[in-house]
Amino acid sequence: MYADAVTDPTRMAAGIRRRVMAHVLANNGGYLSQACSSAELLACLYASVLKLAPCDGPMHPAAFEAVPGPGAPRVSGGVFHGEPGPELDRLIVSPAHYALVVYAALIEAGRLDESALDQFNKDGSTVEMIGAEHSPGFETTTGSLAQALSTAGGIALGRRLRHETGRTFVFMSDGEFQEGQTWEAVQALAFYRLDTVRAVVDVNRAQCDGPMDTVMTIEPLATKLKAFGASVDSVDGHDVAALTDALERPTGRPHFVLAYTDPTRGVPIMNARRPVLHYLRFTDSKERAEYQKFYEEVLLVGSTS
């Protein structure tokens, strides 16, 4: 592990929020609520749970030279997880709009150079706003939401046929359970008893069109998943000990950790924006100044305490 990598999940989660907030301030907007809700989830994965190949130091992202095709250079965002191995874990990120949060987590973990965020969403950069298979931390393009769980199932089945023992983790959002492909994937995972698949779900109950329960309710989610043959743990998504225990618990079945989270966690001034939290774009200079003050007086102070 790189010497400057953060190894404590609680510290890493705070660093993720701080980096995303700084980026949002510098760019007049961003997916801040996703960082608030998922910081502990990604921190637990990268700091405690995932068994990845060691990293000699933070890497710079490759340039985007051409769309995938014959003769085009192949760039995989999975290189930031180190060399794959039969006993090592894989992580498939499903909600590609969480890309900024994933980049922040990789920086905290010492796997991505912090200057990478200077390339965010720029022409010719792989550090995209919506992550793709060439973006840091993304092994696959998960495109429309709900595709990654199926992809992870195929990866896990292939690994079983190769007698590999490593696990395949999936980071998901709760809105994906409004889509049929997710449930087809759960059914297949259970049928093939792919117990090396472990999904952690950011249940922040918020989506692009507003609160989940005003669009399409998904509860009782745990009951539904169990009926499909999966094992389930429901936990406080900001409790790193509970998250780690749930992610590591062997069950003999595909396992889902439903992490119930708060999309304003760590940045309570966002509550004034409820119920619309999906993407933060400052409405005027006054609002931006309020967030700047919070960043300087709370988030930055907390990083030095």
Mark where each language-model region is.
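Conserved thiamine diphosphate
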Residues: E164, D213-A246, L300-G302
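Short acidic, glycine/serine/threonine-rich loops at helix termini
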Residues: Y103-A105, A132, Q181-W183, D209-D213, ...
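Generic beta-sheet signal
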Residues: D89-L91, G166-V170, V197, G252-T261
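Cofactor-binding active-site loop characterized by glycine-rich and histidine/acidic residues
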Residues: V20, C36-F191
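Glycine/aspartate-rich loop-and-adjacent alpha/beta segment that forms the canonical ThDP
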Residues: A66, K224, V240-S305
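A short, conserved beta-to-alpha structural element at the edge of catalytic cores
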Residues: Y192-T217, L221, S234
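N-terminal capping segment at the start of a domain
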Residues: A13-G29, D202-N204
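A short alpha/beta connector and helix-capping loop motif
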Residues: E179-N204, P254-Y260
